[in-house]
A protein has these predicted regions:
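Alpha-helical transmembrane segments of integral membrane proteins
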Residues: 28-40, 61, 65, 84-89, ...
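Alpha-helical membrane segments and adjacent membrane-interface helices in multi-pass membrane proteins
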Residues: 61-121
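Short helix-perturbing small/polar motifs within transmembrane alpha-helices
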Residues: 37, 41, 110-150, 199
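Short, highly charged, low-complexity non-transmembrane loops/tails of multi-pass membrane proteins
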Residues: 8-10, 206-226
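Hydrophobic transmembrane alpha-helices
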Residues: 2, 13-84
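Membrane-water interface at transmembrane helix exits
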Residues: 44-52, 77, 97, 101, ...
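Aromatic-anchored segments of alpha-helical transmembrane domains
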Residues: 40-48, 91-102, 140-150
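Membrane-embedded alpha-helical hairpins and interfacial helices in multi-pass inner-membrane proteins
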Residues: 134-208, 221
Length: 226
């Protein structure tokens, strides 16, 4: 009987310790991911502002966003190893566009939803903890900024009129020269390629998972000793 009580007590102690560890880890993850989300929002907003400096900046802003946003997004994905990560990023990006006064057309909304679904499927197929799942998933998710830009190709005349009213005829005429299917294809290919390479670079050169694991093991050993 005493042995059974001891075993039950040990199980209860272990379960309490596990619950405390999970709570501590959840707080740690939140305190880590929240700044990364803010950085992601700031970078996306900066890219949107940059895109209106010149028509060429407008074209390269999508692959540029794929490069500079890789750091915060990859770190978020390495922490959040569950379904819905890209859906959350899509919602965050959509909120950023609303704050900036950018409206999504129906076709843009479809593109955004499609990008989110494809990104989620890629990570689900390749694994939520795998590097390839992060890299390929992020490569697909890098196309999110294309959501409100696709209007240039789906309804060129209306979009050009809008741009002319906001930035002038010169800007509108220069931007109109990029309204070809070849440019759209090149933007998609370039964005996916640099998105994958950027995510790969962050994973290879900013290894936090190993350090975190070692620290957790040390804490676990100290806990067991006590």
């Amino acid at each position: 009987m005493e042995n059974k009580r001891d075993i039950l007590n040990e199980v209860q102690v272990d379960s309490v310790a596990d619950a405390q560890r999970r709570k501590k880890e959840a707080r740690k993850n939140f305190s880590f991911m929240f700044p990364m989300v803010l950085i992601y929002c700031a970078l996306m907003a900066a890219v949107e502002f940059l895109s209106f400096l010149h028509p060429f900046c407008w074209v390269v802003s999508v692959p540029l966003a794929a490069v500079i946003c890789a750091f915060p997004v990859v770190f978020i994905l390495k922490k959040y190893k569950k379904p819905g990560s890209f859906a959350i990023l899509g919602i965050i990006w959509y909120l950023v566009t609303i704050i900036l006064g950018i409206k999504l057309s129906f076709s843009g909304l479809i593109i955004t939803l499609l990008v989110v679904v494809v990104s989620e499927l890629i990570r689900w197929i390749l694994g939520y903890v795998s590097k390839e799942g992060i890299c390929f998933g992020y490569a697909a998710a890098s196309l999110l900024p294309l959501g409100h830009r696709v209007y240039l190709w789906t309804d060129t005349t209306k979009y050009m009129d809008l741009i002319a009213s906001l930035f002038g005829e010169k800007y509108s005429d220069q931007l109109g020269s990029f309204a070809t299917e070849i440019i759209l294809f090149l933007i998609i290919i370039a964005t996916v390629a640099v998105g994958y390479c950027s995510a790969r670079f962050v994973i290879l050169h900013f290894r936090t998972e190993k350090k975190i694991t070692e620290r957790e093991q040390e804490n676990s050993i100290d806990f067991q000793d006590h």
